[in-house]
UniProtKB/Swiss-Prot annotation:
Binding residue positions for Zn(2+): H173, H175, D186
Limits of the MPN domain: 102-224
Protein name per Swiss-Prot or TrEMBL: UPF0758 protein Csal_2972
The keyword Hydrolase is assigned to this record: yes
SUPFAM superfamilies cross-referenced by the UniProt entry: JAB1/MPN domain, RuvA domain 2-like
Annotated NCBIfam families: PRK00024.1, radc
Species for this entry: Chromohalobacter salexigens (strain ATCC BAA-138 / DSM 3043 / CIP 106854 / NCIMB 13768 / 1H11)
């Protein structure tokens, strides 16, 4: 049955307008993005097929061009639209943490850092530099490593923090393996960074480890 033949309350577009995007399933949201299905399959049917083929929403969203276009019903035009949508989402979150914005929402910080790091195939270590009033100065990626390591030097981080006149930092790095549980090495480098920055009265407020669908906070664990 085509979507236009469904009861109005069950159609993805009408459902979104009535209840908001958060009320829709992954398949329904993807169906709106796809707009149309293929012969014998509605857009929602196709969306469900694609989620099954990719193994979920995240692998679909992070697929490269070749993998994306290998599925029936997708192509370069859809890939371009998807990449543009994802980048708009990242930039929207980034705009909420522009220079001078005060950090009033831990959830927003977590979402922003996740959007910047979770999709990366390599490990990256980043920092959010803040002034003494915890207003954003700058977000920077400090190092990029292999799939299992990233080099971070406390002396260089301290020098950068002083150059930006930062009063506090929030660190974040991703685990491409998808497991967000911090390693012993993660805890050691965080302590070294905290000790080095503490010599200049610069506080480390938190360190987030970003995994697949999970983010671990050092502050929430009582490690900072």
């Amino acid at each position: 049955m085509a979507i236009h033949e469904w009861p109005e309350g069950e159609r993805p577009r009408e459902k979104l307008l009535a209840l908001g995007a958060s009320a829709l399933s992954d398949a329904e949201l993807l169906a709106i993005f796809l707009r149309v299905g293929v012969k014998g399959r509605s857009a929602v049917d196709l969306a469900r097929d694609l989620l099954l083929a990719f193994g979920g929403l995240r692998p679909l969203l992070e697929a490269d061009l070749a993998r994306f276009c290998a599925e029936h019903g997708l192509g370069e035009a859809k890939y371009v639209q998807l990449q543009a949508s994802l980048e708009l989402s990242r930039r929207h979150l980034g705009s909420l943490l522009e220079r001078g914005a005060a950090l009033t929402s831990p959830t927003l910080v977590r979402r922003f850092l996740t959007s910047q790091l979770r999709h990366l195939p390599h490990e990256a270590f980043a920092a959010l530099f803040l002034d003494t009033q915890h207003r954003v100065i700058r977000f920077e990626t400090l190092s990029k490593g292999t799939l299992d390591s990233a080099s971070v030097y406390p002396r260089e981080v301290s020098r950068r923090a002083l150059a930006l006149n930062a009063g506090a930092l929030i660190f974040a790095h991703n685990h491409p393996s998808g497991v967000a549980e911090p390693s012993d090495a993660d805890r050691r480098i965080t302590q070294r960074l905290s000790d080095a920055l503490g010599l200049f009265d610069i506080r480390v407020l938190d360190h987030f480890v970003v995994g697949d669908g999970e983010v671990v906070s050092f502050a929430e664990r009582g490690w900072l």
